[in-house]
Amino acid sequence: MTIDHEVKRRRTFAIISHPDAGKTTLTEKLLLFAGAIHIAGSVKARKASRHATSDWMEIEKQRGISVASSVMQMEYRDCVINLLDTPGHQDFSEDTYRVLTAVDAALMVIDAANGVESQTLRLLQVCRARNTPIITFVNKLDREVREPLDLIDEIERTLGMDVIPFTWPVGSGKRFHGVYDLRHKLMRVFRAGMDRVEQEETAIITNLEDPAISERFGANLEQARQEIELITGAAPEFDQTAFLAGQQTPVFFGSAINNFGVQEVLDTLVELAPPPGSRKAIQREIQPAEKKFSGVVFKIQANMNPAHRDRIAFVRICSGEFRRGMNLKVVRSGKDVRTSTVVSFLSQRRELLETAYAGDIIGIPNHGTLQLADTLTEGDHLQFTGLPFFAPEIFQTVEIADPLRSKQLKLGLAQLGEEGAIQVFRPHIGSMLLLGAVGVLQFEVVTHRLKHEYGVEARIAPAKYQLARWVTAETPQELQRFIDANAHRIAYDAVNAPTFLASFSAEISVAEENWPGIRFHKMREHAGLMFQTAG
C-alpha cells in the first residue's frame, strides 16, 4: 500500500457539543456500529459497572461529564476512522480548541429540545475560522423537543451556513415514529428501548403513499410530508465543495441512546468527510502524502494509567508514514524521541503501534521531553502553527497541609500543567505557585487529581490577580527593565515566558501607556511565540 492510498483511507474528526447534548453517548454508539466495541456503556447508568468508553478519568465516571479529550481509532468500510471525543464542559474549551486543530472535520451534536447553545456556538466559531467541514446530528428526538423547522432556522442563522437536511423527523417525543431519508427516499422506523445496546436492524418503509402507512402514523406523517415539501423547495442542493469549505452542513435527526440515526451519520462521515489535507508550518505548507514523517503534539495527558504515573503525548501525524523504531527529532530541542513504545488508542485502552499514516493520532510516552505544540520530524526543521495558549481568566493560590509532600505537589502541578488543562505560574518574587484557568471546574479537577493520582491534599484559594498578559519587547534589555520595575507582578509559565499579572484591566492599560516598548499578549503559541495583542 502506498502512503497516498493510506492517507486517502483516513477520516479524522472531533465530536463537539454543549454539555448534556448526548455527545459521549453518540461516541459510544459510533464505536458500536463500527464494530469497535460490543456493548455501549450508558453515560447515565453510573450505578452500573459500565461507564462510557470515552469517559475514563475517575472524576468523569463520578460526575458523568467529559473533562479530558479521548482519542479512539476504528476501521469501518475500508476506512480508518480517528474519532476525538472532546470535553463538553465550558471550562475545558481551551483543550477542546487544541483538539480541533488536529482534525479534518467535526460532528456537531445538538439537543433537539435546546437548539444551538453557547458552548456549541463558541466551538463552531473555531471550526468556521478554520473552514472545518461540519456534519450536524440533532439528538434526543424521542423526547419532547422544539419544532424541527425552528431548529433548522436557528442552526442556519447562528452558524451562518446553509443547512441541508439529509433526514427529517416524523413526529417527536412519545409520537416519534422515525425519520424520512431525503437522499434515498425512504422512511426508517423508530423503535424505542433504552436498554438496547446491541446493533439492531432498522425497519424501512419505501412506499409512504400506502394508505396503511398513513393510517399507522397519522397526522405526524402528514406534517412531516408538508415540512419536507417546504424544505425541499427552500434548501439548496447539497454541494460537496461547499461542504468541504465549511459553507454547508448536512443535518441528521435521531436518538443516539436508542441507536437510531447513528448508522447514517457514520456512513456519511466515511463518504463525505475529507481525508487529511495539507498543514501550515512557518517554513512551508506540508502535504500529507510526503514521504517524510512530520507530526505535532496537540495534547499531553498525565496518568492515563495511574499505577505507572505515565504521560502520553498525543501526536497528529501531518505527513508521511510512522514506523515503529524510526528515529524522530523534537525540532524545538533537537532531542531524539524513542518510538519503540508508541501506541494507538481506544480511549484508555492502548495497543503498540507498528505503522501509522498522516491523519492518524498516535501516543508517545513522554517523560518531559515533549511539550504541547512540539513538532516531530525525521530531521527537517519545521514548526507547525495554530496551537494556542490562552491567558487565564481566574487565578488561585495553592498550598498543602503537609509540607513533606511539597515535592509531590510540584511534580503533580508540573505534569498537569504540561497537559494544558491548568496553567502553573512561578512568581518572580516569592515561592507560592499560582494556578491559572479559564473556568472554575478546572481547579476542582486539579485538586481531585492531585489527591487521587499524586497523594497530595491541596488547598486552593482565590488569588489577588484576575488578569494575565504575556509580555515581549524588541530587545532583551527593555524586557528586563520592565520585569525589574514590576517584579511583584511578574510570573513565569511552564516555558518560562514572562507574564504580567493584574487585578483590574485598568492596571494593564496604565502599564501599556507607561511602557510603549512592551507588548502585552492575550495568547501565545509554541515556546513563547506570540500572537494577538491585548484588547
Curated annotation (Swiss-Prot):
It comes from the Bacteria. Residues 8-277 form the tr-type G domain. GTP binds at residues 17-24, 85-89, 139-142. Keywords: Cytoplasm, GTP-binding, Nucleotide-binding, Protein biosynthesis. SUPFAM superfamilies: EF-G C-terminal domain-like (SSF54980), P-loop containing nucleoside triphosphate hydrolases (SSF52540), Translation proteins (SSF50447). GO terms for cellular component: cytosol. One of its GO terms (biological process) is regulation of translational termination. Increases the formation of ribosomal termination complexes and stimulates activities of RF-1 and RF-2. It binds guanine nucleotides and has strong preference for UGA stop codons. It may interact directly with the ribosome. The stimulation of RF-1 and RF-2 is significantly reduced by GTP and GDP, but not by GMP. PANTHER family: PEPTIDE CHAIN RELEASE FACTOR RF3 (PTHR43556:SF2). This is Peptide chain release factor 3. It comes from Nitrosomonas europaea (strain ATCC 19718 / CIP 103999 / KCTC 2705 / NBRC 14298). The lineage of its organism: Bacteria, Pseudomonadati, Pseudomonadota, Betaproteobacteria, Nitrosomonadales.
